Regions:
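Short beta-strand micro-motifs enriched in acidic
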Residues: 299-303
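Short, surface-exposed coil-to-beta transition loops
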Residues: 291-295
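Fungal intrinsically disordered, low-complexity serine/threonine- and proline-rich regulatory regions
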Residues: 3-59, 63-65, 73
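A domain-level signal for the mature, folded cores of soluble proteins
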Residues: 11, 36, 58-60, 67-290, ...
Length: 489
């Protein structure tokens, strides 16, 4: 085992991407009952202090259906919330956009997104890396090797039975977005964003670049739902003439294996969803965002699994491997409906914020085996280099170095889809990517504070208290980037 230090560098790799074009894949899923949509208005200069560029907003088509978002318009609702939080019932205490003009027809959109060529499949994108395994030296083969024990102890995930937003493929996600510098489209780079050229956006604005949905997310475009990626958990099925094994999802997981000091190897299993549906307080939903990265970390010591860390909003829990429920010898985890926060048990998971009590919910829904469809990599902490592994040698690496957000920027107060209360927003900014999930962590916990390893599973309904300080804590950054603000995963 190599002796590797716990530090990071920028680790930029040469950019020689082939000329690729995007493909548009579509999915369908059962939408919830329709509710009235909100009007929208163009952001004002006061709503975007970090850019002085012209604001352009993508307009949705009229064919999409409205989404299921409760509209906080009645005075009774404001009174109930004010009473609940001990605040004035004056609506002036709330930040809520006035109803403005309805969305214009697509023909009147401020910009037109050109149709992307549909010449490559998602699988072809994932095999578009330019590494040649036949040229690997013995040392490089070792550097790219995934230990068999990592796969032997790969986690299972029970998705929620009533989930509306299933796992998604980041290659497909890129076909539905326009990169923006804050709220301004990056015209010269808006087309053909692929897994092999995404890092080029770092030259424009770094963390101020947002992969912004081409659609109005309140109308629930099908690609957000990912229903074609629901894993089959009863027997095997035939898909396009080929057998699809039990537990396999069409949405690939991303495995990043990180060797560390003293025989430690961390195996990060990353899961991507195109949409995060926030939780409710008194039937008001907070924390929606486009793009959602979650992960399970299995830590090994000298080849044996010793601990498991589960991502859960911005904090998460860590367990001794012996404490986790298993199928055979593999850990069993549970993904919460909407938020996709990871838990070790099924049931209700309340957590107490300054705003009030929110709940995640998990159950034994479709069983997902991420190891059946994954793209795997090794990550070197000394030079920050991500390498496609011996299992998926053609997997591209450029996307990993993208430093911006995988979703829209938090909508401004002038956008009628947005509202806030007690510092919490209905829509928040999309998350940073897998690179920024503290891959170099010394202990197994996600955050930088005290790391508590549980040797038992919590009882159902055990509440977790989250302090304002924890909410402000920046925990999903790597040591090779500056401190970040506006992190709301």
């Amino acid at each position: 085992m190599p002796e590797l230090a716990h530090f990071h560098t920028n680790g930029q790799l040469p950019l020689n991407p082939p000329s690729l074009v995007s493909t548009s894949l579509t999915t369908s899923y059962n939408r919830p009952p329709s509710y009235p949509t909100y009007a929208s208005s163009t952001p004002t200069a006061n709503d975007q202090p970090d850019t002085d560029q012209v604001v352009v907003q993508i307009q949705p088509t009229s064919s999409s259906k409205p989404c299921h978002v409760p509209k906080p318009s009645s005075s009774g609702l404001f009174s109930r919330l004010a009473e609940y939080f001990g605040l004035s019932s004056d609506k002036g205490a709330w930040s809520r956009a006035k109803q403005g003009d309805q969305y214009k027809d697509q023909a009147e959109a401020l910009i037109e997104i050109d149709s992307l060529s549909e010449t490559m499949s998602s699988a072809e994108y994932w095999n578009s890396g330019n590494s040649d395994p036949s040229s690997w030296s013995i040392e490089e083969q070792d550097a790219r090797s995934i230990p068999q024990y990592v796969l032997d102890y790969a986690p299972y995930v029970h998705l929620f039975s009533g989930e509306e937003f299933w796992p998604c493929d980041i290659a497909e996600h890129l076909t539905h977005i326009t990169p923006k510098l804050n709220y301004t489209p990056i015209y010269k780079m808006r087309r053909d964003r692929t897994l092999n050229n995404l890092e080029e956006l770092n030259r424009v604005g770094g963390r101020s670049v947002y992969l912004t949905s081409n659609d109005n997310v309140e109308e629930r475009p099908d690609w957000l739902g990912g229903s074609s990626n629901i894993p089959e958990d009863v027997g095997s099925v035939m898909t396009n003439g080929t057998e699809r094994p039990v537990g396999r999802s069409s949405a690939p997981a991303v495995l990043v294996v990180v060797p560390k000091e003293d025989g430690i190897v961390d195996a990060f299993w990353f899961y991507f969803y195109s949409y995060n549906l926030g939780n409710k307080v008194l039937n008001i939903r907070f924390g929606n965002h486009v793009g959602d990265w979650e992960h399970t970390l299995v830590r090994f010591k000298d080849g044996a699994p010793v601990q498991v860390s589960l991502s859960e909003h911005s904090w998460g829990e860590a367990y001794a491997y012996s404490a986790i429920e298993k199928i055979g010898k593999r850990p069993l985890t549970f993904s919460a409906t909407g938020s996709h926060a990871m838990y070790a048990t099924p049931g209700l998971h309340p957590y107490v914020l300054p705003l009030g009590v929110l709940h995640d919910q998990t159950d034994r829904g479709p069983l997902w085996d991420p190891s059946l469809n994954m793209h795997s990599y090794t990550y070197n902490l000394q030079n920050g280099a991500l390498l496609a592994s011996n299992h998926t040698p053609q997997a591209p690496t450029n996307w990993f170095y993208f430093g911006g957000r995988w979703g829209d920027k938090s909508y401004p107060s002038s956008d009628s889809r947005q509202y806030s209360f007690a510092g919490q927003y209905h829509y928040v900014s999309g998350p940073l990517g897998a690179r920024f999930k503290n891959l170099g962590r010394a202990n197994v916990c996600q955050g930088g504070g005290k790391c508590e390893i549980r040797y038992w599973l919590p009882p159902p309904g055990m509440a977790k208290h989250i302090s304002p300080e924890q909410l402000q804590e920046t925990v999903d950054t790597d040591l090779d980037v500056d401190s970040l603000t506006d992190i709301k995963d």
